[in-house]
Amino acid sequence: MVKLFIGNLPREATEQEIRSLFEQYGKVLECDIIKNYGFVHIEDKTAAEDAIRNLHHYKLHGVNINVEASKNKSKASTKLHVGNISPTCTNQELRAKFEEYGPVIECDIVKDYAFVHMERAEDAVEAIRGLDNTEFQGKRMHVQLSTSRLRTAPGMGDQSGCYRCGKEGHWSKECPVDRTGRVADFTEQYNEQYGAVRPPYTMGYGESMYYNDAYGALDYYKRYRVRSYEAVAAAAAASAYNYAEQTMSHLPQVQSTAVTSHLNSTSVDPYDRHLLPNSGAAATSAAMAAAAATTSSYYGRDRSPLRRAAAVLPTVGEGYGYGPESELSQASAAARNSLYDMARYEREQYVDRARYSAF
């Protein structure tokens, strides 16, 4: 079957008219008109060639029509993939097998599979129907339409249709464009068993040109990496120093000899509660110094009951004292005891009784 293209058809043309026009040269299987062009399927190839020779530029309803072989067929529709081929099979034997269904343009065997290019798409379809899942030289081969444009060997067709860049003149395995779409500066090594092999890495960790880039990828795991104790202590001290500078920078600088001597002293009492003097008032400074001297004696004494000197216990009748510094001294105890020795106020009992009995 041959498909013919008819162009520049007049509006008055009908399918029946076109069919009868081409049936003069052979059997017409199908006729379709689409707007100002159409397609005619003729069974015999010789009849199609005669129709093209006689009807091209034929005047129909005052318009010259164009008749030629249809060129809109897909290139992949004539390419067959033949799998599970016997290792003893040759190209000539496989070509002869497929020529039973039509002319074969090319036949190439690659290991246990092959690619066969038929001249016509209808012949390729007939070959699939007749040879798929059939025995050939002791093996059951599988025939189907090929959808791959990959050229795995120089002998498989012309150097056209690279599936990576779409340009002609080279096979895909020799294409300068890598799989990511960028131009590669090396020739990709082809592995027959596993396909294309990725080139090995040439740079180690940290040697990339983008490794030290300020705008590159962030290291989110830097805080979790193990660091030495000295590094951690130094980082903590630096952060504390920076925090103190930021928070104390707005406070005025106090220049005082008392404060300087206190800070420079090597023996600093942690319980000392001296108040910082004001540099603007000398009297206030003196008062603070006196208060500090008084409070230092209070905080400086030994407050442990075990190391304290034993107090003299008072005798009976002298009251209870709590040491020489207590307010309950012996004199106060004697004054308190004398109150019990005073004569009580005595009333006249009979007078009061007579007053209450009058009522």
Swiss-Prot record:
Zinc finger (CCHC-type) residue numbers: 160-177
Gene3D superfamilies, per database record: 3.30.70.330, Zinc finger, CCHC-type (4.10.60.10)
CDD domains: RRM1_RBM4, RRM2_RBM4
Location in the cell: Nucleus, Nucleolus
Domain RRM: 2-72, 78-148
Molecular function as annotated in GO: RNA binding; zinc ion binding
A Pfam family it matches: RRM_1
InterPro entries attached to this UniProt entry: Euk_RNA-bind_prot, Nucleotide-bd_a/b_plait_sf, RBD_domain_sf, RBM4_RRM1, RBM4_RRM2, RRM_dom, Znf_CCHC
Assembly and binders: Interacts with TNPO3, which may mediate nuclear import of the protein.
Entry protein name: RNA-binding protein 4B
Organism: Sus scrofa
Lineage: Eukaryota, Metazoa, Chordata, Craniata, Vertebrata
